[in-house]
Structure formats: structure tokens, C-alpha cells
């Protein structure tokens, strides 16, 4: 009964209300650790104040939807207080103190809720949906309120949680964790001290809190760290329950408070798990202290009261877990169980899910405590799981003992992961029995696995979410999927496969409802596991299957499973655990699954929601989508290919352009482009040929034009040339000597021009060359010279306009043509020179005349010919040429007159 009660409290803590309260605790948890340092006063102290009946509403507002647990308690908190009074005389006798502890617990929750800010919003939605319904159902039961009040009264555990959060924040420094645990203990202890004050008012509350406080106090010196750890573990269970959406937190054994704290408490529970696993002695002490505290509370108080106290103690860390633990214990031990059976059982299952982790350490340190609890009928559900007295604890306990031990042997890390995954019952039974059987071994196994899981989650947290991510990491192994982890533990225990999924659990357990719940948790857990690769990846594949199964399986089947699970577990604890686990799993699945996604506001949750619902859930769907997309693409490609093959014509391809416009347009375009390219190439070839022809023609024309240009530029040149020929003829006939002198002069000019032909401009050179060329033939054939000159002149005149039009082009080609013409002219001028031996004789004989001619040619070069420098073109102005020709013509005229 106590087992179910503590489990209920854990379940309550797992409820989205508590999760949101954990979020708020996380928000306030930074102050909560400081509050933990302030032994008596936590940030949760105000929360404790809110814990009063009126404070339940404050809790609701504080925790928002996570307050659903508080909502329920708000509505049923008056009942809860009476039930608390019934369950725990201290709580009932002194509801003020119960409220006070509740306030402290609530304050812890608030602080955790603050810390769990990220989770708060996500949990709000979660709580709003399935958990709200469950909490409303529980609200109907005053027992739940009383249990919750007891849970709140057990603010010590919650204080422990918040202290544990502080401790967990320090748990990076494990020694700091121990210190923080005492601080949180002292805060819890002071909360307990109010309980002790109320103990003076009520022995039951006293016994509960005095036992808790005494145990905490007693163990606080020795197990101060341990008892906070224990409280935190219980609280972590409760918080794990609270953070059921954070299945990972539930998966982490020691992370119930972190679940409750969502983010900060996640760190706390992670730290707690680490401190437990890091300092197994302290971990065992914590659990032992918690168990002993629970047992002491159980022993000191009535079983119900003790259960309430234990629930309160463990739930103190988590209001809802405490409440449900108390409620579960009370319901198990009193009539509130039926009322709270739905929520309490779910809470118990959540507690179990959370307690499995706690139970792992709890049972380790609580082997004697478990014996006490067994004697006490496992007053705390989580502890009852540790204590095998409860029927379900015994039933699953032995099964899960072997499973837990088996899991420990096979998957020590999986133990912490798998045990939560295998199922709440399995986890608790496994953890409780296996850990009870082998406290040190199981403790090491659970601690090291939880450590590893938490570390894995830490890594994920640090990588994806920072501290919040770490909390989420822890929450996921611990809180988020405690049920899922329980189912996974069941699966793994059954199949010894760490990858066993809720489907495997269904196959192994043969309980579709329970397994479907586990499937839901598996789905969530896998989603959360997406944040924890090592923890989640094992089940991610199966979670995909379970995701599909869950998607196919409505939420109702999970409720049906819960209902079926209730008969499956005839014993009240088992029924409560199964029912509430299923319920909580369903709510958890719906709340954490549905509200997780909607409640992404928290840094953790958005990632979780995305990763959970969008990551692992969507992983197979993404793969399927990719495959479908690839197939679609291939089909489209095939269709295009077929269409193209069928429609080879560009028109048909254009018609099929809508299907594949790019593929089909290129066909005609390519053809057109090819045609255009070929056309252009042909045009280029033609143009090149034309250009070459034109260049050749230009070369020819240029040769003529240069003489003609000279003549056109110098109107006297053509006449001069003809006149020169005629004059030379007359000179030769009349005065051979004078003519010879003139010819010699011309030849000398030609020679001098030939010597510097590279410098001469083509026009003048040509004129000189043509004059020279025609001078030498004139000696042999004088009559040909006028006709040649005339023909050349006519040719030049005919080409004059063409030359004028193409003068620009000729200018561009002038250099090349000039070189060619110079070469040809040089050859032609050499021929006349070779032929004119007479000229050479003249040159040889009248050297003085040659010198004179050269001087004249020099003069002529100065005036008529361009200078040799690069400024020849500048110097070769019409003025100079005209002057030169005038002088030359004047000289010839003088000679002619002399001849005449």
C-alpha cells in the first residue's frame, strides 16, 4: 500500500502538473539551491506557503498547467488536507503545518518549476490535456488531496529535491553535491522541522516528519547527503513522475527531482544520480536514508500515516509525488486508493517509473529499509517496490529482481535506462528486488548505468540544450520515460535486448494495454531518447515501430490497457501501479507527447518535442518520406524519359514540357543551337575567306594606290612621271651626258631610297621605285614607260574610290601591305638595277656626279622624302612633298628648256 502510495507520489510528480511545477521549481530552483543553502527557507518556502489549500491555486498559477497536479490538488486540496489529516495525523491534525510543508514542497516545486521553465510550458499543455483529466479525476478524491498535502508536508523531500537540484548543479562537483544535499536536507530538514513543529501538534505528522526529519536529522549528519539524495531520489521519482513528459528524466534513476525540476532539477537529479552513482556510498546512504527515513516514518507513524509520511518524505521533494505517494499509500492503506486509483495508480506507476531509478538505489540502501518497508507493506510505493511486501512489488519484484539483475548483468547502463524503460512495475520490481538483492551490485549497476545514461544525457544536454538540455537528458533517462524505461526494462528483461521496445514489452508481457502504455512511453522515450542517443538510440528503432503502433493505437487503447491492467494486477498496489502507470503512461504519453510538442516553449521541451515527435517519431517517417521522394523522382524521370522517347519530335517534347520542361525544351533548343553554331561557323569561314581575299586585293590595290595616292596628293607626280620619262627620252637623244647625269641622279635616289626603304613610307617609296623601275626599262624600252604610267594611273583612278572607301581598312593593313609591297618593290627595283648596267657604269664613272646626286638625294630626302626618323610620317607632309616635286619638276623643266 505504501508502495503504491509512494509510487503514486512519484506518479504525481511525473504528472505534467508536477512537471510544470518542476518547471517552476527549476525557474525558482536557482533560488531553491540557495534556499537549500538557507536551510529552513527555500525558494520553495514561498512555494510551501502556496502549498496551503489556497496555495494550491498559487501552485497552479505558479506551475501553470503543470499545476494540473496542483489543479487537482487545488480542487481537492481541501480534501487532500483532510485526507492528509486522515492519512497523516500530522498533516490532518495540523493542516497548517501540512500546508507549510506543502508550501515548502510547493516552493520547491516552484523553484523547480522555475528551473524547469522550459518544461513548464510544455508541461502546461501536457497537464492541460491528459494529466488534467487524470488530475481532475484525482481531484474528485480527497485522498489525492490529502496525499498531495502529505506530499507537500513532506516538503523535506521536495526541499531535498530542490536542494538536490542545487546539489545536482554542484554535482558536476560531486563533493559539492554532497554538501548541497546536506543543505537541501537542512532545508528539507527545516521543512521537516516545521513538520516537527506540527509533529508536536500531530504525532502522525510528527512521526512522518519527525521520522523523516529524525531520519533525515539522524542520517542527515551521516547521510545528510544520502538522505537528500534519497529524498531527491524519491523526489526525483516524484519529479520523474512530474516530468513524465521528460521520460528521459524518469529513465535516470536518481533524477526524479530533476524531473520535477524539469531542467534545474533535472540537473539535480542528474547530479543526484551522479552523486549516487558517483558516491555510491552516499547514494546508498541517500537511498538508505530515504528508505530508512521512509521506514522510520513508516515505523514511527501508522502504516498509512507512515506511508503518507514516506510519501510525504519522498513526495516532499515533489508535491505531486508526495501527494500521490501519500495518496497511493493512503489509498492502498485507506479508501483513498480507489478514488486516487486512477491518478494514484498512474502516479504509483509513475512513481514506480521514477522509483525504479530511486528504487535501484533505494533498494540498494534500503535492503534493510526494504525489509522494514516490507514489514511496513512497502508503505511507499517506490519504496514498496524496493520493499517487496506490496503484492505488485512482490509480483513484479521477483520477476524484475531477476530482470533487474539480468539487466544489470546484461545492461548495467540499460539497467538504469532499461529498468525505467521496461516498465514501472518492472523497474520498481527490478530495481527494488534486484537492487535489494544486490544493493551494492545493483547500486553500482543502477548508479553506473544511470550515471552513464545521465552522462549521455548530459552530453546531449550540453550539446543541444546546455544546462536545460542536461536536465532534459537526465529527465529523459529518468523522468520522461520511467514508464517507458520500465516497459523497456520489461522488454529488455524479457528479451535481454537493450533495444527491446514497447512492442517487445507487449509481446513479452502479453498485456496490450500495459505495453501500449509502455509503447506510448516508448514513443515519448524514444523521442526524448533522440536527445539521448545512447539511451534512446537503443529503443529508437523499436520506438519507431512503437511509434507507429502508438499512432495506430489511439489514446483510448491505452486507457483500455490501463483498465485491463487493473484486472491484470488484482492486488491493489499492482492495480494501482498498473492502472496508474498505464493511466500515467497514457496521460504521460498524451500530456508529455501531446503537450510536450505544444509545450516546446521550454528550451528542453521544444527540442524534446521536435526530437521526440519530430526526431525519433519522424525519423522513420522522414526516411519513408525520403524514399517516397526518391521513388517519385525516379518515376517522374522515367515518365519524362518515356515521354521523350515517345515524343522524340521537339514539338511533342514541347507538348510534354509541363512534365519535364527543362528536359524537353533542350532538345529543340540544342538542335537549333547546333544549326546556329554550324551556320555561324560557316559564316565565319566565309568571312575569313572574304577577309583574306579582300586583304589580297587590298595588297594589290595598295601597291597601286600608293603610287596613285602619291600622284593624287601631288598632282604633278603623274605628269611628272610621264614627263620624266619623256624628258629622259629627249635628254637621252639630245644630251646623253646631261640625261645620264639626271638618270644617274634618279638611280642614285632609287638606290638611296632602296637603302632606307624600311623607313620610307610606302607611297613615296613606291613612287620612287616605280620611277626607278620605269627608268631602267626606259633605257631599253622607253616607249613602254608612258603606257605603263598611264595604265597604272588608270588603274589607280579606277580603284581610287574603292581605295577611298577602304582607306581606313587599308590604313589598318598598311603596315602588312607596306612590308609586302616593300619586298616586292625591292625585288622589282633590284631587277632594274641589275638590268641597268649602264647606270652602274655611270655611278662608277662619274663618282662626283654620283656624290652630287647623293647630295641632291639627301636634299630631296630632306624635302621630298620623309626623314629617316620615326617622325617621318610627321615630317612627310604634303608641303614638303609638293615642295620637293616642285623643285624636281622645276629642275626637269630647266633641263627641258635647256634641251629645247
UniProtKB/Swiss-Prot annotation:
This protein's UniProt keywords: Coiled coil
Coiled coil: which residue ranges?
673-707
Enumerate composition-biased segments (Polar residues).
81-100
InterPro entries associated with the record: CCSER
Q: Where is the composition biased (Low complexity)?
A: 29-56
Q: Where is the segment annotated Disordered?
A: 1-100, 156-178
Family designation? Belongs to the CCSER family.
Q: What is this protein called?
A: Serine-rich coiled-coil domain-containing protein 1
Organism, as annotated = Homo sapiens (Human)
